[in-house]
């Protein structure tokens, strides 16, 4: 509150808590000049002292923990959260993130700190489809499947935004709407050409889920064009689909600099005044950048836009701030009471560990795992990610107070029960600089003498991530993206040298995307995909290797055998070439979508369908029994896919339509039930009629442990 006008402001109706937010927002808007309105349309919005409006920075991030705002609990990267196949767990994660975000925000207010990364509007989650493993930002997403992405994303948003009937806890932002997955180096001028079926069946469903099921309050437009229109200024995407079809009632923000791209790079218009007007008119309310604030006044003068059109955007933004409680006394906003000391608390740290454990995905095991500590005297650890904090964190991360790398976690677990030798061995990538490119003789000797060797490699966000202009351009990597999916050669050579010693070798991969192993998978005894596992990653990996935790994670992406199997990176047609993702890929996978082993075994049986013939609007139920027939307690992710058996046109090979992560003690069994409805679960998008439809004919219900490990099948018929 501004003291010089405190009494007047207290009497102002836009501070009157007895009025609804919509009325208060309209009152505030009516008092603002055009200049003041325009000033609020950038991510860095200045104060309006005469109206009691505090300055506000809209830019904040919380992809897997509160990011870039000091110490915070760091959870596994988004792709690792997807590997849990556990939406309820991810809701718990998001609740913790939003608790820490609220606590940080109110602590900042006490110190009159209104700077970037201190607000309550967060530009997370990233729900783009991880179409191609070469895309550098894929690890920010929930993987390649629209259904899984929608389920995980929905619970993440619900956890962030809270369940108070009046106030928003935070504003979550679904990004990047709507067809966006590389190349990073071309994102400011690239045009993603996409057909209507791929748009509605692959790229839009997760956004629709978050808008309709999670009531996400903000959507971010992408940098690139989609079929010729800027995604951040597309009437088709932002008005016809988002608001008219889906009923979205929040606000839209551009990606940072995307409004400038409209004239500067996409060449859709010629001037910044035109870009500013086009952005507002098509439904982009907030510009991350300064184009609106610098040029909208002139846009009005030139007759490109009216003040009334600007009012719509300003109203949406202030309504969001009202709903966050920014114009109400803190004592009546429940979320404002969250204490600062919950930040990075022990309870939150334990949830980070639990999530990391749940994300661990066992790709191969010849029986060497779990390690029996009583039968091992010496372990040789080699690899560039064994003590690499960056490999815990991914990108868009906070600062963990006590990060645990793999070698730290291993030492904590083993203690004095076995001897551990460790060497980085080689760098992640041979980048032309002086570095570690070959294993030394002393390392080879350590491996030979060991009972078991562990190579910890993969990538980190230095090599795969957001656009790196003027940055990385070496063999296999280009400005954030990968140009090849094979493991860097110096790591391959190191693993080969270790295998040649005759000592059993376990590979721990820390990465955010699929990695081809050039045949090494045949010679390795075990492979564990650990993703970027967050602040307790080292403890989680050690617990899995020694059997204290039985892994149950599943791949949210396909692992391909080689780059040569992939279609053109710039082709957004899902069925091009060999096809993108498990839904269209016709080649042989290295490890399929949904794959993940356990130390125990599960038996599926007794699949029943309550209706074999039905109409498109009739619900049907399936049930089956799953039993843990192994020697360990464990988790299994049961997966249900549906395959169209007699389509007259190209359909996905199969599509995930439900899943559940269950825990079963050894010898226990459980009956699992799912319900479906054809018009939702068996549909396709008819481009001619511009609506979802169901083909009449036969469909196969597939139940299994992965997209390729199908244990039970039944055929149903839609009349």
Name the predicted role of every residue range.
Residues 2, 6-684, 693-708:
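Glycoside hydrolase catalytic-domain context in secreted enzymes
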Residues 690:
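Extracellular/periplasmic metallocenter environments
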Residues 709-719:
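Short beta-strand elements
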